[in-house]
Amino acid sequence: MAMTMHVDIVSAEREIFSGTVNMLFAPAEMGEVGIMPRHTPLITRLKPGEVRLQRPEGQEDFFYVSGGLLEVQPHVVTVLADTAQRAADIDEAAALAAKQRAEEALQDREGKLDYARAQAELAEAIAQLKAIQRIRKKLG
């Protein structure tokens, strides 16, 4: 029998996922991390991006997180996200509109612009769109 671990993905609003997985991939600050059962304990910050879960049945689940923390214990992994949602639930039109607004804000040299905020909004929209693209590719 393959080794598994319990994963909880929780946002400020609600629990998004709770179940058994073989492996988790997450967008840590220093790059993507892959977590398997019995991984050494770890706490790291997450940047906006996709969390991917490989389930024992062979199924993969995709989630978008806007940032947060990843806590790893030998048999339990917790993703504490600022906001999180299943990739299938992301509104693609809204993500495209947010990307467009952020790109326009970054090009507006005369307006009062908070570059850090505009860049964060752009990164978030791009991460959402990537999550949508990956799930579409996976589903064929």
Curated annotation (Swiss-Prot):
SUPFAM superfamilies linked: Epsilon subunit of F1F0-ATP synthase C-terminal domain (SSF46604), Epsilon subunit of F1F0-ATP synthase N-terminal domain (SSF51344)
Keywords: ATP synthesis, Cell inner membrane, Cell membrane, CF(1), Hydrogen ion transport, Ion transport, Membrane, Transport
Pfam families (UniProt xref): ATP-synt_DE, ATP-synt_DE_N
Membrane-topology annotation of the record: Peripheral membrane protein
GO MF, one example: ATP binding
UniProt GO cellular component terms: plasma membrane; proton-transporting ATP synthase complex
Subcellular localization: Cell inner membrane
Major localization listed first in the record, in broad terms: membrane
Coiled-coil segments: none
InterPro entries on file: ATP_F1_dsu/esu_C_sf (IPR036794), ATP_synth_F1_dsu/esu (IPR001469), ATP_synth_F1_dsu/esu_N (IPR020546), ATP_synth_F1_esu_C (IPR020547), ATPsynth_dsu/esu_N (IPR036771)
Protein purpose: Produces ATP from ADP in the presence of a proton gradient across the membrane.
Similarity-based family: Belongs to the ATPase epsilon chain family.
Subunit structure: F-type ATPases have 2 components, CF(1) - the catalytic core - and CF(0) - the membrane proton channel. CF(1) has five subunits: alpha(3), beta(3), gamma(1), delta(1), epsilon(1). CF(0) has three main subunits: a, b and c.
The name this protein goes by in its record: ATP synthase epsilon chain
